[in-house]
């Protein structure tokens, strides 16, 4: 089905973008945009998608931290600790990704992960990474607990989902060691 409309969608997407450029920067630059696309000076990813609808998205996580998933149609309130943050974050990314074909970028993820680690384990948690913080059957150090939560998030993002045609989420994260 989608292939039938590909050529028309490309034309529509280019027209929508040309109109926006014209409104912002004038007719000359708008015309140059089309010329540059047609002569392959510019590349625009997946122009054949739904006209006027973005392929990828970068989100701010602040509304999620204040309202949870309620405003996205979910029932989860705002996360209160590291465990609820990681679990709800996974649901957030899957909820957003079901509305876009491309990647979901969450540039604030590590910053808020750090916030909830600090909330649960103290501002000086980096000084106590080797402390045992879980006394269940396996005694776990703080570094292992943090690693497990991070793995939970990453592994969950790699699970195929029905709302994405049984594909995994295309998730962008910046991680610097």
Annotate each predicted stretch with a short phrase:
Residues 1-177:
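Catalytic alpha/beta active-site cores
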